[in-house]
Amino acid sequence: MRVSAFALLAAAATAAATSVQGAAEGFAKGVTGGGSATPVYPTTTDELVSYLGDDEARVIVLTKTFDFRGTEGTTTAKGCSPWGTASGCQLAINKDGWCDNYQPDAPQTTITYDTAGMLGITVKSNKSLIGQGTAGVIKGKGIRIVNGAKNVIVQNIAITDINPQYVWGGDAITLNDVDMVWIDHVTTARIARQHIVLGTNACNRVTISNNYFNGVSDYSATCDGYHYWGLYLDGSNDMVTLQGNYIHHFSGRSPKVGGNTLLHAVNNYWYDSTGHAFEIAAGSSVLAEGNVFQNINAPVESSSLAGNLFTSPDSNTNKVCSSYLGHTCQLNAFGSSGSFNQADEGFLVNFKGKNVASADAYSAAQSVPNNAGQGKL
């Protein structure tokens, strides 16, 4: 019996749509998610929530848009305008008294927001959440991998439109008290606050790769259409690989690194920022190599720099990496961008013996905008 080439291609496409593609590099190397579990295909928001939150190992395939807006009604509450009252300025929800305690002089206002966006969908251990082509979208609500969850893969989905006008209106991806998590080929856009946040509890081993963090928005804390709240990595014992991501159109916190985070930022592409990319707090450590910074006003916020930073500044200095990472660190590249030149070496020993992502020359990162995000597997 002869099998047509079309049939073989169709079978391959189906297999690709129902299983994780590739494997995590870096700190989350070895993560398996739902493994070989029989794929399930939720059709309603309730089914999606149920599959993600149960105790079974699962491969969950999204074949449509799951729009959570309106599913939990709206909330009208007190808010404030700490960044101005122009039409492009984000407003702030008075969550946990934030306006009262931190912005008492800001103009007060009343806000009506979509309740579903405030708290993401809980994702438990041993899950693979994957999208089919470009069809898998979660709109109006993020995801939360928290409370001891382990061995989770999120790949090839989009998370969008979470109360974009209102700070404290919800985050796209939240990790807190987890281990072995891989976030890959995800697109995030029009988010209230953080596109991805690692909370103050230990998130341990995490790889964030090939994602498109899209900061274009009608509303921002800087009132200029550039989202400020990008990536916030603040765990107490975190090792994070940030690899091959397209980080576009942010005015700050892309990423903010704090807690006791060890971050390996490799072969990413930052493009178009009116503010800063890295913000590095005391106790955290960042190694950046093989990245491209194009039209980035400040690759690092120097006024607040209190942690460790190795920027792979020149070929001679970069040789020190080989003893700890197994390779000589790669130079970064800059176009119409600010200064990024620091060589703290003492923390590099923390990479020794760990799963460290490979690093290509910065020329490889030039292709990142075409390969990052949903539908680019």
UniProtKB/Swiss-Prot annotation:
Catalytic reactions on record: Eliminative cleavage of (1->4)-alpha-D-galacturonan methyl ester to give oligosaccharides with 4-deoxy-6-O-methyl-alpha-D-galact-4-enuronosyl groups at their non-reducing ends
EC class (word): lyase
Top-level lineage group: Eukaryota
Major location (coarse): secreted
GO biological process: cell wall organization; pectin catabolic process
Isomerase listed as a keyword: no
EC number: 4.2.2.10
Annotated compartments: Secreted
Transmembrane residue ranges: none
UniProt-recorded Gene Ontology molecular function terms: pectate lyase activity; pectin lyase activity
Signal peptide (residue range): 1-17
Glycosylation site list: N126
UniProt entry keywords in alphabetical sequence: Carbohydrate metabolism, Cell wall biogenesis/degradation, Disulfide bond, Glycoprotein, Lyase, Polysaccharide degradation, Secreted, Signal
Role: Pectinolytic enzymes consist of four classes of enzymes: pectin lyase, polygalacturonase, pectin methylesterase and rhamnogalacturonase. Among pectinolytic enzymes, pectin lyase is the most important in depolymerization of pectin, since it cleaves internal glycosidic bonds of highly methylated pectins.
Protein name, per record: Probable pectin lyase D
Phylogenetic placement of the source organism: Eukaryota, Fungi, Dikarya, Ascomycota, Pezizomycotina
